Protein backbone atom coordinates (compact mmCIF):
# COMPACT_ATOMS: atom_id res chain seq x y z
CA UNK A 1 0.00 0.00 0.00
CA UNK A 2 1.13 3.51 -0.77
CA UNK A 3 0.18 7.10 -0.04
CA UNK A 4 1.76 10.43 -0.84
CA UNK A 5 1.71 14.00 0.40
CA UNK A 6 3.00 17.16 -1.25
CA UNK A 7 3.64 19.88 1.32
CA UNK A 8 4.22 23.48 0.22
CA UNK A 9 7.14 24.99 2.15
CA UNK A 10 10.18 27.12 1.41
CA UNK A 11 12.20 24.93 3.81
CA UNK A 12 11.72 21.50 2.23
CA UNK A 13 15.42 20.62 2.21
CA UNK A 14 15.90 21.54 5.84
CA UNK A 15 12.86 19.56 7.00
CA UNK A 16 13.82 16.53 4.92
CA UNK A 17 17.31 16.43 6.47
CA UNK A 18 15.90 16.98 9.98
CA UNK A 19 13.46 14.10 9.56
CA UNK A 20 16.14 11.76 8.22
CA UNK A 21 18.68 12.69 10.90
CA UNK A 22 16.11 12.43 13.69
CA UNK A 23 14.81 9.02 12.66
CA UNK A 24 18.32 7.88 11.72
CA UNK A 25 19.12 7.63 15.43
CA UNK A 26 16.47 4.92 15.76
CA UNK A 27 15.97 3.27 12.35
CA UNK A 28 17.90 3.06 9.06
CA UNK A 29 17.85 6.36 7.17
CA UNK A 30 19.81 7.72 4.23
CA UNK A 31 19.71 11.06 2.47
CA UNK A 32 21.47 13.53 0.24
CA UNK A 33 20.69 17.16 -0.57
CA UNK A 34 17.45 16.37 -2.41
CA UNK A 35 16.19 12.90 -1.43
CA UNK A 36 15.89 10.75 1.63
CA UNK A 37 14.61 7.35 2.70
CA UNK A 38 13.63 6.18 6.17
CA UNK A 39 12.95 2.50 6.85
CA UNK A 40 10.63 1.82 9.79
CA UNK A 41 9.36 -1.53 11.09
CA UNK A 42 5.91 -0.70 9.71
CA UNK A 43 7.07 0.54 6.30
CA UNK A 44 9.20 3.02 4.42
CA UNK A 45 9.06 6.77 3.83
CA UNK A 46 10.68 8.34 0.77
CA UNK A 47 11.21 12.10 0.75
CA UNK A 48 12.12 14.54 -1.99
CA UNK A 49 12.88 18.22 -1.47
CA UNK A 50 12.11 20.70 -4.22
CA UNK A 51 12.56 24.49 -3.97
CA UNK A 52 9.02 25.12 -2.65
CA UNK A 53 7.72 21.62 -1.90
CA UNK A 54 8.45 18.60 0.28
CA UNK A 55 7.13 15.40 -1.27
CA UNK A 56 6.65 12.35 0.93
CA UNK A 57 5.68 8.83 -0.15
CA UNK A 58 4.75 6.26 2.49
CA UNK A 59 4.69 2.52 1.76
CA UNK A 60 3.50 -0.21 4.10
CA UNK A 61 2.09 -3.72 3.90
CA UNK A 62 -1.36 -3.05 5.37
CA UNK A 63 -3.77 -0.13 6.00
CA UNK A 64 -3.07 0.11 9.74
CA UNK A 65 0.70 0.28 9.24
CA UNK A 66 0.28 2.86 6.50
CA UNK A 67 -1.91 5.00 8.77
CA UNK A 68 0.70 4.79 11.56
CA UNK A 69 3.49 5.74 9.16
CA UNK A 70 1.50 8.72 7.86
CA UNK A 71 0.81 9.86 11.43
CA UNK A 72 4.46 9.56 12.47
CA UNK A 73 5.72 11.50 9.44
CA UNK A 74 2.98 14.13 9.79
CA UNK A 75 3.52 14.76 13.50
CA UNK A 76 7.29 14.97 13.27
CA UNK A 77 7.23 17.26 10.23
CA UNK A 78 4.84 19.62 12.02
CA UNK A 79 7.07 19.57 15.10
CA UNK A 80 10.09 20.62 13.02
CA UNK A 81 8.00 23.18 11.11
CA UNK A 82 6.63 24.89 14.22
CA UNK A 83 7.23 28.29 12.59
CA UNK A 84 4.68 27.29 9.94
CA UNK A 85 1.61 26.63 12.12
CA UNK A 86 -0.76 26.54 9.13
CA UNK A 87 1.19 23.76 7.40
CA UNK A 88 -1.21 21.16 6.03
CA UNK A 89 -0.16 17.59 5.27
CA UNK A 90 -2.80 15.78 3.24
CA UNK A 91 -2.07 12.16 2.43
CA UNK A 92 -3.54 10.64 -0.74
CA UNK A 93 -3.87 6.86 -0.69
CA UNK A 94 -2.76 4.94 -3.75
CA UNK A 95 -1.10 8.05 -5.19
Describe the residue ranges of each PLM region:
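Ser/Thr-rich, low-complexity intrinsically disordered terminal regions
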Residues: 25-42
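Beta-strand/loop substructures that line and gate deep hydrophobic ligand-binding cavities in soluble
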Residues: 41, 45-60
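Eukaryotic, polar/proline-rich low-complexity intrinsically disordered regions
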Residues: 1, 46, 93-95
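Charged, terminal alpha-helix-loop-beta segments
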Residues: 8-11, 30-32, 48, 71, ...
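Short glycine-/aliphatic-rich beta-strand segments at the starts of folded cytosolic domains
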Residues: 1-10, 15-18
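C-terminal structural segments of small proteins and small subunits
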Residues: 58-95
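A generic structural signal for beta-strand entry/edge sites
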Residues: 2, 33-37, 51-55
Amino acid sequence: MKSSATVPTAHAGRYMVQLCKHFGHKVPAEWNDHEGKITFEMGEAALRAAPETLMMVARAGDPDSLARLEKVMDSHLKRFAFREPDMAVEWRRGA
